[in-house]
């Protein structure tokens, strides 16, 4: 979503997972810190939400991009990967292309005139199948309620000073 929207900066809680501020460095974004007692999710920009630990029915926030995580400690634990939720159909198509080597799925790439840079971020079919197999149990299981103090204050780490 950050690449799609062309963001130049992100606002990151001091307490979150380490990869979020690393993302700013990777993408050349300006990183700003905020003190926030967030629960379940937080906004990185006006419409991009880190919802990596969120697991609640009907929790999508309209007109946003909500990133979910399936990392091994998350409720739907697949070891890696995630999902981006949006209600913007045009954005969904473009972001799918960005995740899939710039191409549309189900059409051989040689038959496409590629117009989008791709980043090879797609989920493997095996991981997706594993997720579908685990989904019924995840739906029936009460999720862990994460609290902001589950993460250290990243601004105190040497890498960010």
Regions inferred by a protein language model and the residue ranges of each:
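Generic low-polarity alpha-helical segments
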Residues: 1-5, 10, 49, 66-67, ...
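Active-site region of PLP-dependent enzymes
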Residues: 55-57, 65-161
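PLP-dependent aminotransferase-like
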Residues: 2-60
